[in-house]
Amino acid sequence: MASGAPDGKWKVVKKGKKSGEKGGGRKALSESNVTPGGTAPIKMANTVYEMGFEQILKKQNKEQVPPNNIPAEQPQKKQQQQQNPGRKKPQSGDTGSRQRKFHTLEEGLKALDLAELQRELEKSQNMFPESPSIWVKDLAGYLNYKLQTVKNDVLIQQSHDYPYCLVNKELKGIVRSLLAKAPHVLDVMVDHCIFSMFQELDKPTGESLHGYRICLQAVLLDKPKTVTNNLPKYLELLRSQVNRPMKCLAVMWAVGQAGFTDLSEGLKVWLGLMFPVLGVKTLTPYAILYLDRLLLAHSNLTKGFGMIGPKDFFPLLDFAFMPNNSLTSSQQENLRNLYPRLKVLAFGATPESTLHTYFPSFLSRVTPSCPAEMRKELINSLTDCLNKDPLSFSVWRQLYTKHLSQSSFLLQHLVETWDSNSKAMRKSVRETVHSFKVTNGEFSGKGSSLKDLEACDAACQALLHKMKGSGFPWRRLIVIAFVFLFGFVFYDVRTHNSFQASTSHKVLQQSGLLSVSQQAWSKVSNYSLQGQSWLERNVPQYYSQAVEVLGPVLEQVWAKTQEGAAYACEKGSVLITYTKDNLPRLIEWLHSHTPDSVCQFIEYLRELLLHLHRTYLLPAVTYLEAAVQNAWQQYVASCNGKVTWDCVRGQVSNISHSSWTYLQNTTMTVTNWALSIISHH
């Protein structure tokens, strides 16, 4: 059996030789397999040692022991075969000892003998009870040896959980059971799988890597911290293999599996391992693809709040929007599509207390040479900072003199969007603009940035003008008019000692308003008196009848309601207790008895819905919005640019007339067609 050592190399455990045996030291395994000429091939025993690790042991023993002459080993080989007839090996040239390759991984998984796997794992545990690292290495080697396919699958073209999604529950249970027995050597297993993948990638025609990948996913989907606690080690490994893209992609894929069950761990992996190599031509596509899959797998971004700070966010912003960087245009476009979700992650759950820390970096990037798309994004982000975090205004006032050109762009944007700003923001902008006006007066005629200062001053003037003329004060005008009218009437009545002798009474009487108001008041008074008298006569009678008829019923209803509420509370508490006790068992039972086909169907359905959402629903909504906007513009144009009630009435009349005419014509056409058919018969 292959045994693990503290240095991570393979060693061979062999039985001790008898004193009478003669040999020139320890022989390599490939040398001991050489049989005398004419000997028939020996059937290979079905053990993990002989099947899963024979090739690895041959290579390791050849490296550890220099080969001796073959003729000197043949007597010893015969003696070993006589002593251990059950441990015979086939000739090195025997093609029957090779594991056959399957056309697809699904075929290999269906053909896998789980009972044999269980026996080999038990044998490994019995032989090395104190070395769990050997158990997990045996598991990885056995699975990879048994799951060989004719063609290696391209992982970028597969789902993020491939190939583990193809594994049935029985095999998953065996793997998880063994991993649970060796929790302290999971990092050893991860490193073993990665370096075994490296060895296969070094070969011109290396074997498939499905077994190693399945073991990596089994570990990291359950214990992601196995790799996220050692990210610097894997980053160093990645940089050491930067000229070997396939090895780098193997490391990125392996470590990236830690992120699909926990968004925070996935962001750790991306920021610590993949972001540093963003821009490397051969690695950038997978880094962006992994980020896309990670954010797609976690629709709830709240678990990732706090993982991205200004130190990581602004380099991402530059990669997404700055031209002439190391990304291609399509890669930049993909990163820009992910940028809104990265922005949400960066701002976190409480943007009102964190956005002021992003404000300086946003402001410093709004330069005259900044691309238009990036400038638009920066200006919108600065506006969000000012609108959500009031501390951003104080930060802006401190940076104003050092960033005059950038401030002019932001001030001009505030002028253009003044009407859409909130009242709280308008108040803060007013105070800030007054502060800027004072600063502009102090720096006027000084320094070399006179042009930028003039642009800022002009924008401040425009903002002040907007503040003064933001709209006609109808409310104030109505209040003032009411107060003035009340004061005039009060003064008029006081001057003439009575309302009948006042000028106000004469004006109201001449205009007819007084008589109309008197008639209205008399009618209101009359109806009020009638209503009051009716209520006085009928309310006591109706109330007594209602109490007599509905009183017993309401009492019974109230009593039944109390009893029902008490019964519901009692049964509800019992049901809640029962659910708490049995829900985990139910979940476990469903998990163990649900067919894999159901899980695959749900996954396929999810992918289908996502495809429909992206391919059909979003374009349909966009088309509908454009159609509605176009229809509205045509309607406004038909009204000569002014939507009035007369225009609406005319449009409705035209539509009704057109519909009625069309209905009449259709009816006549159908009638004529029916009559012609009848007449022919």
UniProtKB/Swiss-Prot annotation:
Sugar-modified residues: N300, N324
Chain intervals for the UniProt region annotation (Disordered): 1-41, 58-99
Transmembrane segments annotated in the record for this chain: 471-491, 608-628
Disulfide-bonded cysteines: none
Pfam families: TMEM214 (PF10151)
Origin superkingdom: Eukaryota
Gene Ontology biological process terms in this record: apoptotic process
Annotated GO CC locations: cytoplasmic microtubule; endoplasmic reticulum; endoplasmic reticulum membrane; Golgi apparatus
Protein location: Endoplasmic reticulum membrane
Alphabetically ordered keywords of this record: Apoptosis, Endoplasmic reticulum, Glycoprotein, Membrane, Transmembrane, Transmembrane helix
Signal peptide extent: none
Membrane topology field: Multi-pass membrane protein
Entry function: Critical mediator, in cooperation with CASP4, of endoplasmic reticulum-stress induced apoptosis. Required or the activation of CASP4 following endoplasmic reticulum stress.
Family under the similarity heading: Belongs to the TMEM214 family.
Subunit structure: Constitutively interacts with CASP4; required for the localization of procaspase 4 to the ER.
Name under which the protein is recorded: Transmembrane protein 214-A
Organism from which the protein derives: Xenopus laevis (African clawed frog)
